């Protein structure tokens, strides 16, 4: 008996999932605050309704990461082979152009209108941290960057770096991929902090695109 479990998402499906993720992202950034800042509804043991809704909204990251793993695998399956240099060039050129564009727009605003100087943000080793932050790797290196919400770039950069090697395990070694993702999640290793919660979502996206035979 032969079977294949595969998730076939069309463009409208992925757009719908992205839309849901964007709504969750909005929920997270609007309502994830420290309890006690306003008259929130107390649920139990120091948990408050609005804050819990904000925490739930961070599910958006897992959805985005799942779709990234899914989309990269669909594209790789079409070409049947990953050209390492070409893959990295295509992915990172687009990623960094977007990231640096955000820097060019928002960092001057922070400096001019909110007194968010590099010294006040990085505290020490300012130039080293600035370079790391411009490279999008601040969260991976143990600190939040100029804007804490940009931590996601560390996550996606590392996942892009890992993808060609994870792809080689796809299919025959799905179990190893899943155990790797779960192992990193459970271990909570500090030097893998940028991906330890999301590698499993990325891997599941890859497996969903490739199918389980």
What is each PLM-predicted segment?
Residues 181-190:
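Membrane-interface alpha helices of multi-pass inner-membrane proteins
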Residues 173-178, 192-200:
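Short, aromatic-rich membrane-interface segments at the entry and exit
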Residues 1-182:
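Membrane-cytosol interface segments of multi-pass membrane proteins
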Residues 65, 200-201:
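Catalytic-loop motifs flanking and including active-site residues across diverse enzymes
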Residues 201-211:
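Alpha-helical transmembrane segments and their membrane-interface exit regions
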Residues 82, 189-195, 209-213:
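Juxtamembrane membrane-interface segments at transmembrane alpha-helix termini
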